């Protein structure tokens, strides 16, 4: 997905907590669109192969949660994690990891991922169609910066991870912000 392109319009089927429902599963369906997530704000979107998978659960998502406040310091208003998983899986994953800041977006059918050009087969792992690992800075629905792991392909034997890490994105944003404002970075 080249920079300066608008994110595609997609409606996501989410499950949101609703205390008026009561019982052991107080959630209702809610449709949220890409406009709801991206319009009028500057956000980081990162996408990964799947909920509950090793790198995603032990490094990428926990690190974004831990570094969330650092993104606010460089003008990011929200951080979203998207995966080709349904709302039930994404909610259970967020609960299992104790997420409080990063918001999860369920791309159950893979429609958004396909329209972003990032849908790949992971049949070699028994996953079916999933997202390639990537991240983007999205400013008012337009891709401002793009971070894609190398080796994009179906049934990739490896699981590359660095370009879309929060550490790399923060470093890039800090450098970009410094250059944009004409500041010289201070090194200690």
UniProtKB/Swiss-Prot annotation:
One of its GO terms (biological process) is hydrogen peroxide catabolic process. InterPro entries: PRX5-like, Redoxin, Thioredoxin-like_sf, Thioredoxin_domain. Keywords: Antioxidant, Oxidoreductase, Peroxidase, Plasmid, Redox-active center. It is an enzyme of class 1 (oxidoreductase). GO terms for cellular component: cytoplasm. The active site is at 56 (cysteine sulfenic acid (-soh) intermediate (for peroxiredoxin activity)). Its EC number is 1.11.1.27. Residues 2-152 form the Thioredoxin domain. Belongs to the peroxiredoxin family. Prx5 subfamily. Monomer. The active site is a conserved redox-active cysteine residue, the peroxidatic cysteine (C(P)), which makes the nucleophilic attack on the peroxide substrate. The peroxide oxidizes the C(P)-SH to cysteine sulfenic acid (C(P)-SOH), which then reacts with another cysteine residue, the resolving cysteine (C(R)), to form a disulfide bridge. The disulfide is subsequently reduced by an appropriate electron donor to complete the catalytic cycle. In this 1-Cys peroxiredoxin, no C(R) is present and C(P) instead forms a disulfide with a cysteine from another protein or with a small thiol molecule. Thiol-specific peroxidase that catalyzes the reduction of hydrogen peroxide and organic hydroperoxides to water and alcohols, respectively. Plays a role in cell protection against oxidative stress by detoxifying peroxides. This is Peroxiredoxin y4vD. The lineage of its organism: Bacteria, Pseudomonadati, Pseudomonadota, Alphaproteobacteria, Hyphomicrobiales.
